[in-house]
């Protein structure tokens, strides 16, 4: 990759985009799956909140990565877009390989109040979509909604490709040239590779936090601009629910939890 001037701050920038251009202070983006989880995270002081496609799909009893979750994704965006935080929506692959259909989805999300969208090149069958197809989606979305922050994700480290670094570099270059505002590489935890990607990109790099991987401070030092939590919070909530039930069943004490009134307040009631 040959960047023009890596991480230069554009003259005009949305508040959400600006959170990606704070050297040494990456945006920590927690991911919600419903209104209550998003409201709780906003109340805790997070200025921007993403959605998790796995959490949204699983909470609705739907498979992650399937076109059936499109309606749930839009429905949740319409609810969350009315709140006071900056909302970025995990739109999977755009639920279509037709760039114009993906652009139409982006328009719906922007009209709902979303300021960012995540688009991934991984497919439900574990393969990668052709990079040209994904780049066309990115370009179509930017043409339709220029102010929407497009975070183009490659699943090169998740889809079993041989030599994932060269494949990721090739794809990220195609996506930033198509107009992506940022790029995302989940599954990457090697500090040396992260540093090389940051050096070669002209747009902010997003990394998925993972247990055993680099911490927030180390990622900041590597030049990462955004750190996402993905489905971690949803999976943690499931684990906490099961553990709490087990504690009650075995007579063990239960840890502190929000009160009834606190939860009601999250919905404004």
Predicted segments, located by residue:
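Actinobacteria-biased recognition of intrinsically disordered, low-complexity terminal regions
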Residues: 1-13, 269
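A general boundary/transition motif marking the beginning of the first structured unit of a protein
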Residues: 4, 129, 254-255
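Alpha/beta enzyme core
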Residues: 8-87, 95-229, 235-238, 242-243
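Extended, intrinsically disordered, low-complexity segments
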Residues: 231-269
């Amino acid at each position: 990759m040959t960047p023009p001037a890596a991480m230069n701050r554009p003259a005009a920038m949305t508040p959400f985009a600006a959170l990606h251009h704070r050297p040494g202070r990456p945006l920590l983006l927690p991911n919600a799956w419903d209104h209550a989880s998003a409201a709780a995270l906003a109340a805790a002081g997070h200025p921007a909140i993403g959605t998790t496609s796995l959490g949204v799909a699983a909470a609705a009893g739907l498979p992650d990565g399937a076109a059936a979750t499109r309606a749930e994704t839009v429905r949740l965006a319409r609810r969350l877009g009315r709140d006071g935080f900056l909302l970025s929506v995990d739109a999977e692959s755009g639920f279509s390989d037709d760039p114009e259909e993906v652009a139409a989805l982006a328009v719906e999300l922007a009209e709902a109040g979303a300021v960012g969208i995540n688009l991934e090149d991984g497919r439900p069958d574990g393969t990668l979509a052709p990079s040209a197809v994904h780049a066309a989606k990115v370009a179509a979305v930017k043409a339709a909604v220029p102010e929407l922050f497009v975070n183009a994700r490659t699943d090169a480290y998740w889809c079993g490709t041989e030599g994932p670094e060269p494949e990721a570099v090739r794809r990220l270059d195609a996506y930033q040239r198509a107009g992506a505002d940022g790029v995302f590489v989940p599954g990457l935890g090697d500090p040396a590779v992260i540093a090389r990607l940051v050096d070669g990109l002209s747009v902010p790099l997003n990394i998925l936090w993972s247990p055993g991987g680099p911490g927030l401070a180390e990622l900041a030092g590597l030049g990462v601009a955004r750190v996402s939590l993905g489905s971690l919070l949803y999976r943690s909530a499931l684990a906490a629910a099961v553990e709490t039930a087990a504690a009650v069943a075995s007579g063990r004490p239960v840890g502190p939890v929000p009160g009834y009134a606190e939860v009601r307040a999250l919905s404004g009631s």
